[in-house]
């Protein structure tokens, strides 16, 4: 019996796994049926509809790091080169050729596309492979007779394994509904509608790429000062040289590093850092300030929002209060957004496998080579939490081809059609 892999969210990770599974089947190789459950549409989070962008900002990585990159498959001994060749049919370059945009893209110097164009590429691949998409929002995840069950208002999807993707909800904010506190979705909704933001003192909470994208947009609005609030001592620039990029596209040797070394590498290259392009814009704008601290709480008072910040100084916690006319909550993706969806049976299963409470730290440290929670059957794949254990490229767009290898090479349980293969990523037998 062919196994079923259900994926929550129809973004790049879902498309990458579905495309490789489709090509494996075209080669006559057993692969799971991939069913994607999506509330909005394929690539929605890369458009204004998803709330994470207005669709006009540029992709932060090279588009050539597409759904098959780095094209170094290790799933089918002696036929991996054939699999990679098949995957190039779904590459960024193939999309440009098929849509008569390739020559212009080359002549313009291979620019990063805007988010809207990236979403169009994902839809093009999904259409080409006939990706099975069930439209609906997952409201509950439970254990069923087959394995997992994903419950939407209209239907229930049963699967042998589940992969959870996506950044969570862009609507979350410190003070929901308050007109002086904007969520990520509120911000992009206004900019997509060409509404001018006018304020004296603006606070941007967050020091990562989500906040950076909003800062890049905010420069064009009528604000007097912008204070970026983050826990770091300063606004760090993301390392974008060859050696930093290699960490993302080739995780060989990552597991030989200590946890402390891995965390240090991730903080320097991925978490809480701005791209060099955004940093350059910050340098040219004297309205930008940085305030170190974590926001403990926010209260409206006297027509302003008062933020209480906690800062550690020499081991002592210091509390300060600051007032702003407008607060933008740009804290970004929540890798644990799915936890409230878990039914009690699912929580019990995961806590039993973890040997402790269901925390982000334990989940990260449990992620195995196949990007699933270790010690848990049926499989629950969490690539968004795989950075610490398996490599910093897995949670983002940096090695979608390797990610799909890991997941499709996993043992999906008693009903699985594929045996567990450990990928030999650096020099696969082809």
UniProtKB/Swiss-Prot annotation:
Keywords: FAD, Flavoprotein, Monooxygenase, NADP, Oxidoreductase, Signal
Database matches in InterPro entries: FAD/NAD-bd_sf (IPR036188), Lys/Orn_oxygenase (IPR025700)
Gene3D superfamilies per UniProt: FAD/NAD(P)-binding domain
Enzyme category, top tier: oxidoreductase
Single GO biological process annotation from the record: biosynthetic process
Reactions that this protein is recorded to catalyse: L-lysine + NADPH + O2 = N(6)-hydroxy-L-lysine + NADP(+) + H2O
Signal peptide: 1-21
Gene Ontology molecular function: L-lysine 6-monooxygenase (NADPH) activity
Pathway(s) served: Siderophore biosynthesis; mycobactin biosynthesis
EC number of this enzyme: 1.14.13.59
Co-factor requirement: FAD
Pfam (any one): Lys_Orn_oxgnase
Function: Flavoprotein monooxygenase required for N-hydroxylation of the two acylated lysine residues during mycobactin assembly, thus producing the hydroxamate groups necessary for iron sequestration. Is also able, but less efficiently, to hydroxylate L-lysine (non acylated) in vitro.
Entry similarity comment: Belongs to the lysine N(6)-hydroxylase/L-ornithine N(5)-oxygenase family.
Protein name listed in UniProt: L-lysine N6-monooxygenase MbtG
């Amino acid at each position: 019996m062919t196994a079923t892999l259900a994926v929550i969210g129809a973004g790049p990770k879902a498309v990458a796994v579905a495309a490789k599974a489709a090509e494996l089947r075209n080669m006559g190789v057993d692969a799971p049926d991939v069913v994607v459950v999506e509330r909005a549409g394929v690539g929605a989070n890369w458009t204004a509809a998803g709330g994470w962008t207005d669709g006009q900002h540029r992709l932060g990585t090279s588009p050539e790091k597409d759904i098959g990159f780095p094209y170094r498959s290790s799933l089918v001994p002696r036929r991996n080169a054939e699999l990679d060749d098949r995957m190039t049919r779904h590459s960024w370059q193939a999309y440009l050729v098929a849509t008569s945009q390739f020559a212009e893209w080359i002549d313009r110097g291979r620019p990063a596309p805007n988010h809207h164009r990236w979403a169009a590429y994902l839809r093009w691949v999904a259409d080409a492979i006939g990706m099975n998409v069930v439209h609906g929002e997952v409201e509950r995840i439970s254990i069923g007779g087959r394995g997992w069950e994903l419950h939407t208002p209209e239907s229930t999807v049963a699967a042998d394994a589940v992969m959870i993707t996506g950044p969570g909800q862009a609507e979350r904010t410190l003070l929901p509904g308050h007109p002086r506190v904007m969520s990520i979705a509120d911000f992009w909704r206004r900019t997509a509608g060409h509404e001018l933001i006018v304020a004296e003192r603006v606070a941007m909470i967050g020091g990562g790429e989500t906040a950076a994208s909003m800062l890049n947009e905010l420069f064009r609005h009528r604000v007097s000062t912008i204070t970026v609030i983050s826990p770091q001592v300063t606004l760090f620039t993301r390392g974008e040289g060859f050696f930093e990029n290699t960490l993302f596209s080739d995780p060989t040797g990552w597991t030989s590093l200590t946890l402390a070394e891995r965390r240090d590498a991730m903080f320097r290259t991925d978490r809480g850092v701005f791209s060099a392009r955004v940093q350059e814009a910050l340098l040219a704008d004297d309205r930008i300030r940085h305030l170190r601290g974590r926001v403990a709480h926010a209260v409206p008072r006297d027509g302003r929002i008062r933020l209480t910040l906690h800062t550690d100084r020499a081991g002592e916690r210091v509390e300060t209060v600051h007032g702003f006319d407008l607060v933008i909550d740009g804290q970004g993706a929540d890798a644990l957004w799915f936890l409230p969806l878990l039914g009690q049976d699912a929580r019990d299963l995961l806590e039993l496998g973890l040997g402790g409470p269901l925390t982000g730290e334990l989940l990260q440290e449990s992620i195995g080579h196949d990007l699933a929670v270790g010690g848990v059957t049926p499989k629950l794949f969490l690539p968004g939490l795989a950075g610490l254990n398996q490599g910093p490229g897995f949670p983002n767009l940096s090695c979608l081809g390797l990610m799909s290898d890991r997941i499709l090479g996993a043992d999906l349980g008693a009903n699985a059609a594929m045996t567990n293969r450990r990928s030999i990523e650096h020099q696969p037998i082809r």
